[in-house]
């Protein structure tokens, strides 16, 4: 379910302010953020944002195709290592 149109997209104010400040200064550096629920805005294109995934920050380079999506979509929080194999399938006898 998407957010109400009258409210508009959510982005953490501090994150957007830092991106706009970097755009004005024409600098590129990695921005760390814990705000996985922030929507990617067009001003963020070309920047690298390190999104927290629960343990560490995952650097994500923002492209035009990502605009409108959430930052958390590109930093998975769960790692799947596969099911434990049975002794029959492992080949050891």
From Swiss-Prot:
InterPro entries: Ribosomal_uS19 (IPR002222), Ribosomal_uS19_bac-type (IPR005732), Ribosomal_uS19_SF (IPR023575)
GO (cellular component) term, any one: small ribosomal subunit
A GO MF label: rRNA binding
Keywords: Ribonucleoprotein, Ribosomal protein, RNA-binding, rRNA-binding
GO biological processes: ribosomal small subunit assembly; translation
Origin superkingdom: Bacteria
Function as written in the Swiss-Prot or TrEMBL entry: Protein S19 forms a complex with S13 that binds strongly to the 16S ribosomal RNA.
NCBIfam families: rpsS_bact
Family: Belongs to the universal ribosomal protein uS19 family.
Stated name of the protein: Small ribosomal subunit protein uS19
Gene source species: Desulfitobacterium hafniense (strain Y51)
